From Swiss-Prot:
Predominant place of localization: mitochondrion
Subcellular location: Mitochondrion inner membrane
Species in which this protein is naturally found: Schizosaccharomyces pombe (strain 972 / ATCC 24843) (Fission yeast)
Protein name: Mitochondrial import inner membrane translocase subunit tim22
Region of interest (Disordered), ranges: 1-23
Disulphide bonds in the chain: C46-C119
Amino acid sequence: MSLSGLLPPNLGGNSPNADGNLTPEEKAALQQAKIIGYMNRISESCVFKSSMAGVLGFGLGGIFGMFISSLDLQHIDPKIYEKPFREQIRIQARDMGSRSFSTAKNFGLLGLIYSGSECCIEAFRAKTDIYNAIAAGVFTGGALAVRSGPKAIVLGGAGFGLFSYGIEKYMHWGE
């Protein structure tokens, strides 16, 4: 990234102050350029990307969980309707909150693992192509199914890898 537009015109090597005697304005511009460079490096790191995906996945999962739990009425005990209205609202709100939190955790973990693995694979291969997403999908599917045994790991990896392939093909449809 070029910072030439952010620096004063006399900050280069042919400046009258090239010996290190910078004006306060030039020092401030140089410091600002360094800070912008640090911020760019931090925001492009795999840790930052995967953390943001986890946080945003948690938020989106909470919204989805709240919506889905409001539609699912089959698990509610019919005896709830015999209770006072406030008690019904309290019970349903507690259930909605717990299910929303559970979905939020799952979405957050999914976003964290997928984006972190895709970023690491991309950095290792030094390429940006569809194979990064497929490999990250296989890794994520397997990692999420690790508690269920080897067959679930293989099926989860294959399924999520195929899903990642489909999403990537859809996203790059016209290219």
